[in-house]
Amino acid sequence: MCCEKWSRVAEMFLFIEEREDCKILCLCSRAFVEDRKLYNLGLKGYYIRDSGNNSGDQATEEEEGGYSCGTAESHDSKGIGLDESELDSEAELMRSMGLPLQFGRITAHKDFEVSMNTRNKVKIKKKKHQKKYLDEIVQESWRKEYEEDDILASDDPSSIEQYENTRTYELQSKKDTETENPPVENTLSPKLEITEKWEKYWNEYGGGLLWQSWQEKHPGQALSSEPWNFPDTKEEWEQHYSQLYWYYLEQFQYWEAQGWTFDASQSCDTDTYTSKTEADDKNDEKCMKVDLVSFPSSPIMVDNDSSGTSDKDHSEILDGISNIKLNSEEVTQSQLDSCTSHDGHQQLSEVSSKRECPASGQSEPRNGGTNEESNSSGNTNTDPPAEDSQKSSGANTSKDRPHASGTDGDESEEDPPEHKPSKLKRSHELDIDENPASDFDDSGSLLGFKYGSGQKYGGIPNFSHRQVRYLEKNVKLKSKYLDMRRQIKMKNKHIFFTKESEKPFFKKSKILSKVEKFLTWVNKPMDEEASQESSSHDNVHDASTSSDSEEQDMSVKKGDDLLETNNPEPEKCQSVSSAGELETENYERDSLLATVPDEQDCVTQEVPDSRQAETEAEVKKKKNKKKNKKVNGLPPEIAAVPELAKYWAQRYRLFSRFDDGIKLDREGWFSVTPEKIAEHIAGRVSQSFKCDVVVDAFCGVGGNTIQFALTGMRVIAIDIDPVKIALARNNAEVYGIADKIEFICGDFLLLASFLKADVVFLSPPWGGPDYATAETFDIRTMMSPDGFEIFRLSKKITNNIVYFLPRNADIDQVASLAGPGGQVEIEQNFLNNKLKTITAYFGDLIRRPASET
């Protein structure tokens, strides 16, 4: 019998002033129940009880074509339902007259939630696809690198040349395959294209990124210029290379999917300005080097300081791979010469050399060259990537060279300013003025609680602060669609105006066009007849001749208000035309008198007959629809009190067996607990521990008492009003559990010291419906008797107390009932996604997390 949907939302610690060590733990939970079917039955005015648990479902499905049931079933626990929990007399009157109570679709939130779920599923599917695609790229890259490692491990230049030729042949064969097989292009071409772009990107920026990260990991240390060759750092370097490689590959894939593109910088081709080196380098401080590294674990460096016997091999390798590195001055001069000879009108343009890398947020240095593979550097400097000018592949060698160094070339222009990398805000990032931690505030505003400044229980001073830890994800989003009786912030609606000052174009309805044509056809004989009648009746109807179209409208479409209100223009035009006909066509009256009556009779006979047939069909349909429907009017005692009308519509949600003889007094209509909420509370008490006796200190007409008895517990029902005791006994007999309840007419404040029970249920009077108008409900001053006093007396009976309170009760006062260092669970009771009440549980009734039990 417990609620189907119950969740633990948050834990809130309340710290007492001057006693920070004695904090009170407040467990916050939410319970959701629904009774839309019972409410719909109350609106229909009858109730049929069957043997099943879903009472009244069959009757609801049979009547109204299953409308009410369909409406109820279309709302789940997360949807936004009609404002059906509380209907005033005016709304009830509007509903009975068939007028709408609201505008817009009821299922707006459900449609929004379905669309959000679909969007989330698509995002998850895309992420899985990207991850799978990335894994395939990783596997292929590893396989290729291992193959390159096996070939480059040997010093034989012929094997390297053979490998380069094989690689070129493979790429060419792949391109040919893509050209020959267009259908396979969708699966192969994106992968090949992304791989090539990534290789270009990594060859251009990878070295700088590796070396910069290596320096950040080892600050203040004397770094080796070749950590990949140093035995102590070789293994660490390989791990460092692998981590950064796959990290930036993933980032590259992500940013490329977001629409970013990578274009290698334009510069002269390497082969154009590759110059022959001479053996008599006099002042070469930085020697020519060759980068043959494709895998970090096997770097191969060729230095021109080696013996003369290996110079020939070096030259062959340089010609085969074209990975040449000169010192900065020679490269600059070679660039200027080759670019001038290659293209007469092409000149080196000075551009900013600091470009932002989308994937890494890094930028290439400005000191005369681009970043390089850090494992291909041979300098003894601690920052070799920043000072060398080499490239890691022949295809990209000497690309992206922004401008020449200051020694050669045109120095008339100043260097471009160094641009700082711009930080692009992602779509899910918050603005600077937004608070990123708004979901985790210390006030617990997302819970919908009310905090007041009333007196605390047990002499506790005010609470210094609160700490809230949310236990449920997306609390803000879920709370947004719950009606917690607070002001809802609506989004601003923007009205967009066109730049051109033109009149707005309204699309004309097809039905309206047909009606205009019909009226034009009908008004031709009617205007002539009206003119005849106006001349033969002593000008009595002269003033009304301009309204012939209106008279015809009433004869043709009697009762059709839509066309009369929305189409005034045709009437005006027709009146003007009819007046013109009276002045200009008087001489044709005699000739038309013979034809007008025949046409008019045809129209006036056919149209009313069709309208009469439609009216009769509608009346017959309504009679069949209302056939066998039993409508109960308001009882005299309810009709005499207009403010009880809306509670009468909710009678089945108060007692599902209302028609079996349930009786209520005026105060009982206001104070009785809805049956579904009472059923949830009783079920929770019965499931907490073995409970035999429950005291209902303020039983009223027996709403909670009956539900406690239905769970099998014995109940002591107490109330000071003998009328309510009689009503509660009658209602218990209707449910057949009067033998499990002991009714006592007396004052709980006087009887508390003589009672013994396992659980005490407190639901004192809240002062009528006016309790909801208060911003915060003070449980000490706004209840009679005093809320603190009845709790103190209940503690003498047992520590297991259930306190049933209004939804706007002061949470600080409720928490203070637990005492310093104590615990309390405050449960919000939602009825059809609307916050109705809160229930405070003390003692063993608290549902603690599984880790604490």
Swiss-Prot record:
Enzyme class: transferase
Tissue: Ubiquitously expressed. High expression in heart, skeletal muscle, kidney, liver and placenta.
Record PTM Phosphothreonine, positions in chain: T60
SUPFAM superfamilies: S-adenosyl-L-methionine-dependent methyltransferases (SSF53335)
UniProt keyword Isomerase, yes or no: no
GO CC annotation: Cajal body; cytoplasm; cytosol; extracellular space; nucleolus; nucleoplasm; nucleus; small nuclear ribonucleoprotein complex
Basic residues composition bias: residue spans: 620-630
Binding site for N(7)-methylguanosine: W766
Region (Sufficient for catalytic activity): 631-846
Biased composition (Polar residues): 156-171, 564-578
List of residues binding S-adenosyl-L-methionine: D719
Biased composition annotated in UniProt, kind: Acidic residues: 431-442
Pfam families registered for this protein in UniProt: Methyltransf_15
Recorded GO MF terms: RNA cap trimethylguanosine synthase activity; RNA methyltransferase activity
InterPro entries named in the record: RNA_cap_Gua-N2-MeTrfase (IPR019012), SAM-dependent_MTases_sf (IPR029063)
Residue ranges, compositional bias (Basic and acidic residues): 608-619
One GO BP: 7-methylguanosine cap hypermethylation
Complexes and interactors: May form homooligomers. Interacts with CREBBP/CBP, EED/WAIT1, EP300/P300, NCOA6/PRIP, PPARBP/PBP and SMN.
Protein name, as recorded: Trimethylguanosine synthase
Organism, scientific name: Homo sapiens (Human)
The encoding gene: TGS1
